Amino acid sequence: MAFYDREIKRVCESCPRLLILMINSVFSKHHSEDAEIIFLDKEQNIDSGENTTYMDMFLEIESCRYHIEYQLLEGNMAIRMVEYGMKETIRGLRQNGDITRVSDGRYEIEIIMPLQAVVFLAGANKEDTITVNLHLPDGKMVTYDLPCLSASETVSELSRKKMYLLIPFQQVQLYSRMLKAKHYTERTKLKLAEALYHFKLDAKKELDNLHENGILNANEVELLVTSLHNIEDNLLNNDDLIREKVTEMGDEDYIALSDRLIQQGIEQGIKQGIK
């Protein structure tokens, strides 16, 4: 399951402009599309549980800090979000020296939590937010909401929300079913093969449309299509028959511009190598 951890981080780091667009959309920010992104913590935190993988991403854009969790399956992330957010905040304070300061004879500590969000890659979380109620020792309670995003939405909906980075991951909603694929009948396997094929087809059509309308550049499309194929290949590792059927379907019905861009890049690289 660490595959999805590596893949989402690869895509985010390779397409910084698209990551900024998603963050601007989720948090109603207005960061410049070419702003520098500082990845503060690239360590992987993977839960030891059998069915869940958690993926941390701490970053800073124009002095604003963000914490994004990419979760493979559905689950309650509230406790982990508070834990990770607080842990990273305290770690940053300690790196900058003493975490306390004296003001009018009183010791104070200022804790600024990063803006946080959860992205569900396979599970379709039914709520738009996770509410956190933090009860303090003095009886006060602080309530705040964490935005929840789902890669299982339609590609057009992901585009509307400017979550272009998640388009290749839409097919991950078949993750749980693909894990059990070897136990399915041939008829069910054929349906899964068709579902995977149509996820790929719809994604490529959407990416082509975004490129033709000047929303995505050629390099971004190429990176997202590469991710699309990487994820499909990983899902197909669970059953040879489904892989065979998806391969047979091919792309004959639709020659995607995104595939041509990849081929053009290869050919251009060969030409440059010859020179």
Question: Language-model segments: what does each one mean?
Answer:
Residues M1-D239:
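Conserved single-residue anchors adjacent to enzymatic active/cofactor-binding motifs
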